[in-house]
Amino acid sequence: MENKIRVARAEVRMTQQQLAEAVGVSRQTIHAIENGRFVPSTVLALKIAHLFAKPVEELFQLEAGD
């Protein structure tokens, strides 16, 4: 799964730590999501999308083979 979390954070000048605290996960989890090593749960994806006021499908896209 591809995501645009890093881009969304940069747009609002938010750190990984700030995002992690806002959605209730560790900074390491945000790092892993941004680097494609962890696929967030539906609930976590919705929390992140809501925080950035963007549709989930704008932040997360399926890749071939997903």
Give names to the regions the model predicted:
Residues 25-38:
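Recognition helix of helix-turn-helix/homeodomain-like DNA-binding domains
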Residues 18, 29, 58:
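Residues in the helix-turn-helix
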Residues 50, 61-66:
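Short, charged recognition helix plus adjacent turn
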